[in-house]
């Protein structure tokens, strides 16, 4: 029964692995719900900032703020690449990187260079491994990242845009659609589109003019930064929800596969045990007949 003992050892090993994957599935489910709640709570802030910024931009058309310039010749582009810090989340990071690298190659074919800010260690390692130009990064962001952790890399990129060293900035991340579906997304963060600086509020028979201190332009310049930061944070929250959903699905699949493997191993064990018992009985019967 040496073979039977080996099979039992393997069954116990798979059972231990199944316990781990089941625990990871439950943890990911809990984290996904918390991240979804954080996404929901962040949206009203971003929308209010956008509305006030839009109102100010429409009433101060000669603002001269570089971050609100709409037309530039594209010579160099920036990317904010958002990935996870950890693996075991299926093809989530691979899909985002595939979309990102395709866009980088398209720009290079046009003679346009890139500068990259990586948020998340998986994207950073991928960019470094193929020699892309990473100018700043933020990794090990944790389950509840603070905006302060992102300010350094983002400020670096935004300042380069203000100095006309970068002419366009893309935001690349994994968008959360639902628990079973996440899709890689690429959006133009800068220049800010006309759809953002559009109608600042629903039409109403009443309207108000506000007095801003110290000046309307100073408030507008401040709000533009806050708006851009809120968009990036929203994308980061989206990516984290996608990560937890993908990990939950991957761990559920691993748990189910472990269960199937255990069933197959038990079947093999029972067959081998039955064969051994049959052999022993045959030997006993043969011995009795010989006597």
UniProtKB/Swiss-Prot annotation:
Top-level taxon of the source organism: Bacteria
Cell compartments where the protein resides: Cell inner membrane
GO terms of biological process kind: proton motive force-driven plasma membrane ATP synthesis
Keyword Cell inner membrane: yes
GO CC entries: plasma membrane; proton-transporting ATP synthase complex
GO MF, one annotated term: ATP binding
Mode of membrane association: Peripheral membrane protein
PROSITE patterns hit by this protein: ATPASE_GAMMA
Keyword presence, Zinc: no
Pfam families named among the record's database cross-references: ATP-synt
Keywords linked to the UniProt accession: ATP synthesis, Cell inner membrane, Cell membrane, CF(1), Hydrogen ion transport, Ion transport, Membrane, Transport
Function according to Swiss-Prot or TrEMBL: Produces ATP from ADP in the presence of a proton gradient across the membrane. The gamma chain is believed to be important in regulating ATPase activity and the flow of protons through the CF(0) complex.
Subunit structure: F-type ATPases have 2 components, CF(1) - the catalytic core - and CF(0) - the membrane proton channel. CF(1) has five subunits: alpha(3), beta(3), gamma(1), delta(1), epsilon(1). CF(0) has three main subunits: a, b and c.
Family: Belongs to the ATPase gamma chain family.
Protein name (database record): ATP synthase gamma chain
Organism per entry: Neisseria meningitidis serogroup C / serotype 2a (strain ATCC 700532 / DSM 15464 / FAM18)
């Amino acid at each position: 029964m040496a073979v039977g003992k080996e099979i039992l050892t393997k069954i116990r090993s798979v059972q231990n692995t199944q316990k781990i994957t089941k625990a990871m599935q439950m943890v990911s489910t809990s984290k996904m719900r918390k991240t979804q709640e954080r996404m929901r709570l962040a949206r009203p802030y971003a929308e209010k900032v956008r509305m006030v910024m839009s109102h100010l931009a429409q009433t101060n058309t000669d603002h001269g703020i570089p971050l609100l310039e709409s037309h530039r010749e594209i010579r160099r582009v920036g990317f904010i690449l958002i990935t996870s810090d950890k693996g075991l989340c299926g093809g989530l990071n691979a899909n985002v990187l595939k979309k990102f690298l395709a866009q980088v190659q398209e720009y290079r074919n046009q003679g346009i260079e890139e500068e990259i800010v990586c948020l998340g260690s998986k994207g950073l390692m991928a960019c470094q491994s193929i020699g892309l130009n990473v100018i700043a990064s933020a990794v090990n962001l944790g389950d509840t990242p603070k905006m302060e952790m992102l300010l350094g890399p983002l400020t670096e990129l935004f300042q380069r845009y203000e100095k006309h060293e970068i002419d366009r900035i893309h935001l690349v991340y994994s968008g959360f659609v639902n628990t079973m579906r996440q899709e890689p997304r690429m959006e133009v963060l800068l220049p800010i589109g006309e759809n953002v600086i559009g109608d600042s509020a629903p039409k109403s028979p009443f309207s108000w003019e506000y007095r801003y201190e110290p000046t309307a332009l100073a408030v507008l310049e401040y709000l533009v930064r806050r708006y851009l930061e809120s968009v990036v944070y929203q994308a980061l929250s989206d990516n984290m929800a996608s990560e937890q959903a993908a990990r939950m699905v991957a761990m559920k699949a691993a748990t189910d596969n472990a269960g199937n493997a255990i069933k197959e191993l038990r079947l093999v064990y029972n067959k081998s045990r039955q064969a051994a018992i049959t052999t022993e009985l045959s030997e006993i019967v043969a011995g009795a007949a010989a006597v």
